[in-house]
Amino acid sequence: MNQQDIEQVVKAVLLKMKDSSQPASTVHEMGVFASLDDAVAAAKRAQQGLKSVAMRQLAIHAIREAGEKHARELAELAVSETGMGRVDDKFAKNVAQARGTPGVECLSPQVLTGDNGLTLIENAPWGVVASVTPSTNPAATVINNAISLIAAGNSVVFAPHPAAKKVSQRAITLLNQAVVAAGGPENLLVTVANPDIETAQRLFKYPGIGLLVVTGGEAVVDAARKHTNKRLIAAGAGNPPVVVDETADLPRAAQSIVKGASFDNNIICADEKVLIVVDSVADELMRLMEGQHAVKLTAAQAEQLQPVLLKNIDERGKGTVSRDWVGRDAGKIAAAIGLNVPDQTRLLFVETPANHPFAVTEMMMPVLPVVRVANVEEAIALAVQLEGGCHHTAAMHSRNIDNMNQMANAIDTSIFVKNGPCIAGLGLGGEGWTTMTITTPTGEGVTSARTFVRLRRCVLVDAFRIV
């Protein structure tokens, strides 16, 4: 028999092995259920098949291949459905999650021995985990969470943002199909056909689900905190500042800042949101940025743009971002005030004071405020202020070790990038693993399978110490 014949036999056997007590059949595609109860029941049954580490490895390998194979399809669908972001950048995110999310290799048991015997500490699954995913990074978050949670031995009930339900459901279906085709359990990843706020709130309290993973903005994290007493791992908002001092490699800094601040139209919470630059190099840095497909706005143009992009500005200068403009292309934003920019424009930037609404608010669009300061000490202090205690991400461009050390200590973020774009902290151009769930509100930071296990201790007294 050739490989194709074997695959056909495996599929036929799997079909015969389906449990006749399986809940109401999925709607639309594999893993998408008409009701939440049916989805959770299917995920519970599927999770029983993950007790074997070999099965987890098989499922993860299939998910990696499917995630990469369908990365562009999912990127195009995400932009088409949500209107946010850039296809090429979403493609890069999807591929990065498929390749760079750690699997079972990052889970190691601990063994302690001593005069009183042996203690074994194992990584146990939670069982069925609920995952709330955003409209900004829909497919990438599904791929990332699927790998991390399955590696930890869990099945997943996804609650995708309603504005990205089609692409989220498509991703869930494609990954499920790949797992089943490889010989894994059906419905390791499930969701409902019509996700909404009520579905998410039910998941926050659903019996038998012990862990909630929430990736999104302040509102959804606050809602999860209010509506659940379950273990919560939450990824929230950020307002990442990037500081450039007088010692920086300015051409490199300009390239990195434009790349990072424009990546996927700035809808990743880890993207650069405000640039703080020492006055002596500010003009040259901005000139170099204009050579990287960035367009500088005048103060008058920024004044025109502000009421289009922000509403309800409070006494601190923080506004409510208009959802109509989140993640939109720089050219479309410029056109809103009658400004024509070159087609290849990736970023708009404008000089502002430190208290300007563009600097204070997490904009999540390719509009970057630039604030001049007298020296690096002032720059670092302002970066801490504008980061706002989110403890998310920050960056610095400098060739002075003392300056970088000073900012690293002061900024207190989960990710701090030196001499590169902020996305390098997520494995996109930097070393280390990747994730779409950066859990700053609950303190886990850059998540992996290790984040999603329960530690269990087993003790044998007065035995099995062999030295």
Curated annotation (Swiss-Prot):
Q: What class of enzyme is it?
A: oxidoreductase
Please describe what happens when the gene is knocked out: Can use ethanolamine (EA) as a nitrogen source but not as a carbon source. Slightly attenuated in a mouse model of infection. No aerobic growth on EA supplemented with cobalamin (vitamin B12). A non-polar deletion mutant does not grow on EA between pH 5.5 and pH 8.5, releases increased amounts of acetaldehyde on EA plus vitamin B12. A deletion allows growth on acetate, suggesting BMC assembly or maintenance is impaired.
Q: Does the keyword Heme feature in the UniProt annotation?
A: no
Subcellular location as annotated: Bacterial microcompartment
User: What is one GO biological process annotated to this record?
Assistant: ethanolamine catabolic process
One Pfam family it belongs to: Aldedh
The annotated region (Targets protein to the BMC) lies at 1-19
One GO cellular component term, please give it: bacterial microcompartment
**How does its activity hinge on pH?**
Optimum pH is 6.5 for acetyl-CoA reductase and 7.5 for acetaldehyde dehydrogenase activities.
Q: Which family does it belong to?
A: Belongs to the EutE/PduP family.
In Swiss-Prot or TrEMBL terms, this protein is called Acetaldehyde dehydrogenase (acetylating) EutE
Source organism (scientific name): Salmonella typhimurium (strain LT2 / SGSC1412 / ATCC 700720)
